[in-house]
Every structure is written in C-alpha cells, then in structure tokens.
Amino acid sequence: MREPDQGVPIRMPSPHDSGAVNALLADPVFAALAEEAARDYIDWDELAKRPLPAGLSATDTWQLLTAVRRFGSTQFPIRDMRGRVYWYTLTRESSLCVDAIERHCRADSATHRAILHRHGRRFLVGSRIREAIAACQLDGVVVSPDEAESLLMSGRAPRNATDRLILNSHALLYELDDLADEPFSPELLTRLYERLIEGVDLSALERRPVRHGLTDRVESAPVTPEARAGVIQQFCAYANGETGDPTESVAIKAHALLNTAQHWEFFPDFNGIVGRCIFRLFAAQRDYPVLGYLPISSLYQSWSEGRMESSVVRFSSLDTGRSSSETEVDYTPNVLTYLQISVVALDELLGSIARARRRDAEVRSRLEHDAELNYRQRSIIAHALANPDVELRIREHQTAHNVVYATARADLLDLVDCGYLRQELRGRAFVFLPDPDLPERLGGAEEA
C-alpha cells in the first residue's frame, strides 16, 4: 500500500460539494472508520487492511480521518524547530492510562502512602538508581549498569568522570523536592544543568549517539541563541500553567516538557537528563509525586530496544513522518505510547508493593517471638531467605532504606546478636551473611 502523501492540503468543499460531503458522512464505511479513528486511532498500517469508502483512495481517507480527529484535539503551545504545531487526541486507551495515573500517582493516593510508610521504599530506591543510569545512557554516556549500581549502592567516592556524572544525576533526583515550590524559570533550568555537570570532566566521558524521546531526531536549521531563549520562556510559561490547555493531563504535560527540553536542546549537553529532572519536578509541583518516582527513562530504553510486549504498549515503533505535514504533527500515537509506558512502570511499582507486603506478613508470622524486629530487619531476613549466598553491607542497607549509617549498622548488628546473620571481615570492612540454619530456624519460610 502506498505511503500517504506528506504536506498535501485537503481541498475544502464549496457549497456545490455539500451533497457529496453529506453523502460521504452518511456512508457506513466512512462513518465506521471515522468513529473508530476518533475513539481509538487508526494508524496507516491498520488502514491498509480496511475496506475504504467508494471513490476514495487510502491517502484521501487518511487525510479526511485526520481532519475529523483534528477538531477534537489538544494543541501543544510550543512549536518544533521547523515551526510545526503538535496536536493529539485522547483515545480510549489513553483515557484508561490517565485514569490509572490519576488514581495511583497523586499525593493523597494509597500508593503514595504505601511508599511513605515503607512498602514501596525498596522500589523507590531501585527506581532512582535505574533512572540515573538509564538517563545517562539515553544521553549517549557509556555506562556499565552493574558498576554504576555498585557505585550508587556502596556510597564510594567517584573514580572518573562517568562516576561523577552518575552520582550527580542520582543526587539531583533527591534534591528536586526542595525546588517544588519554585516556579519554572530560565534560571532554575540553568541551575539544574550546572548541578548536573558540577565537577564532571566532560572531555573524559565515553560517548555514543544520543536518542531523543521515542523517535529519531529530525534535522533542522541551526537555532540562534535568541530563538532558543524565546522557546525557554515559552516553555516556562507552559510549565507554570500560563499557556496550554488547563484541563490537560499532568502525565501528558510532563512528557511534553521532557521532550521539548530534549528537542530544543536547551543546554550544550545532557538535555535528556535535565528533561527527566524537569519531568519529576513538574510532577511534584502538581501533587503527583508517584509519577515522578517511576523509572520512565529505563522503560523508554526497554521499549526502544523492543523489550516490551504489544499487549502492554500498542506501538513497537513510531514514525511521525506518516502523521505529519509541513505545518503540523499528529502526536496522538506518541502520547499513547508515553502513557502506556508510564502505566507499565506503575504496574511494576504496584507489584513491588504487593510483594513487599506479602514478604512482610510471612516473615512477621515466622518471627512472632521476635516482635521487636523492625520492618527493615524483616526485609533483610526475607532477602536472606531468598538469597542464601548474599553478602550484606552497611552502606548498601543504608542506601536501600534511606537511613543514617548508625541506624543501618545497628539493624545488621542486632540481627547478628539474634543469630539471623553472621559477620565476617572482607579486607578492611565487615560483611554480613545469612546464618546457614536460617531456613530451618524459620520453619522453611520462602520469599513470597
């Protein structure tokens, strides 16, 4: 099937064409296509499999369906480098995603309470580590995930420029909460960038090509500093709610801000990492903290590498060329993909909370005689049961539960005193190992 022609305007009917227009709208084939396109979005490949209205080519039908959907669309207030307008419609699939995000990501949600009270803490720590690593990788920095995770969990000092960048990226995710009451401004964005590159020898980083959002970058003429500064002002107005549709979903707007920062390259480098910080900060400002906790960058990465099933994310790839013209871009499939990736991340979080609750309940039932053990210690015991060869360290426990060093040390030493762990010297530091008799002592308990 031939590709749709790009940039071909649809001829507007004259009064003499009204009969033909009415006949088309009454045509059952076109009416069914228009209804489905408005509710669910029909992409070009799907249209190729459908019967077409009599007398219309596939390209004609595509353009007419786009025109019908355009009437009910939402438009982003910031154009791209080629001056094109971006718009989208909220499909039924998108609406379901927005509903899930509304229910679970707000500050007053049960999910947020679970994170604050403990059951989501381990996920939250792991999510921030994944985000710091994935955001650096998407911005073209060569990173060993295992080495980076070890760096962030151990608390050791950075040894090179890559270590420093990862530490800065990770630290920024924690520091953003302090900025939640500050409106977006060019100065705020500059502070985020300067904090990110603080102490980093940029010339020493090993780099790969940068990926921008879900689609490949479209080349355009160089942007002047004046034009970029103007876009940054528009960006801040949009982020602060001064422009744009006031009813727009927080999740959609957060993704739009992230991708605008990447597309316009606000800074000389690392616009993806800065964009991710903007995403999280905007979510916090709008009282959607859980949205900001989700490991969006790492799941973007999984999607782009083809590691997501079509049952959870509809589109395996995106080509905006099929839905764009010289003046505008239909961004509907991109918005749906962003929302579905967010829901995948949300499902991971909910699963992690459910597993933590089951583990906690099981270990609590096995430790009725040790009622004084706290939830962190029960978490250690559950982890030790599932991983009998694990080596536990104070710094890693401190990072995993966001406690001070003295508390983490006391947790582990108490478990040694109770006989659940044993302590051994490794070099100049102690590690903690599960007692060999731990499963028998707890009656064969296993991780849920």
Where are these regions (language model features)?
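Residue-level marker of regulatory loop/turn positions in helix-turn-helix DNA-binding domains and
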Residues: R121, N271, L373
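Phosphate/pyrophosphate-binding active-site loops
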Residues: R2-F76, R217-G351
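C-terminal regulatory or interaction extensions
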Residues: L258-F266, G275-A448
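Eukaryote-specific, low-hydrophobicity, charge-rich regions
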Residues: A54-R121, G126, R130
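Residues that form generic nucleotide/phosphate-binding pockets
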Residues: A23-L24, E36, R50, A67, ...
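Generic structural signal for alpha-helix starts
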Residues: R39, L90-T91, S249, N374
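Exposed alpha-helical structural elements
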Residues: A20, D60-Q63, T89-A107, H119, ...
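Active-site core of Fic-domain adenylyltransferases
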Residues: W87, H104-P268, R276-Y293
